[in-house]
Amino acid sequence: MDLMELNLEAEETTQIIVIRLGDEQYGVDIKFIDNIVRMQHITRVPQVPAYLKGVINLRGEVIPVMSVRLKMGLPVDEIDKNSRIIILKLDTHGSIGIIVDQVKEVVTLETASIEKVSYDGKDDRINYIYGIGKCEGGLISLLDFSAVLAE
C-alpha cells in the first residue's frame, strides 16, 4: 500500500469517540477532541445559562465547561466515577469542556455509512445532530458541536 492509497483510505473513514449521555449513545468526531479528563472541581461563574457549569483549570489554561445534557433538554447530569470532561478544540469557539456520563470506545466509521439527518420539527435535540453513523454496535447519533455551541 503506497502513500496515495493511505490518504484515500483516511478520507473514507472517520474516527468517532462513543459517549453516553443518560440512556443514549452519541458520537464525537475525534478530530475535535484535545483531551479527556476525569471529573474535577468546576468553579461556578455567575450570571451564565444553567448549561454552562463553570470553568476548570487544566495545566494553567482556564476552560469553560458545559453540560451537554442540559443544553439538549435532558435531565440534570448524574456525576459518578464514569463521568468525564471532554476538552474540545473548535476553530470558532476555542477550547471548551463538555461533561459526559461515560466515554465508551473509539470506533471507525466509513464516511459513506454516515447518513445525514433531516429536521422534522418535533424534537429540538435533532438540531444538535449532523448524522447517524452505522457501526457493528448499532446506530450512533453524531453530535454537531457548532450547533450545540451556536446559541
Model feature map: region roles:
Residues 1-151:
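An acidic, low-aromatic, low-complexity terminal/linker signal
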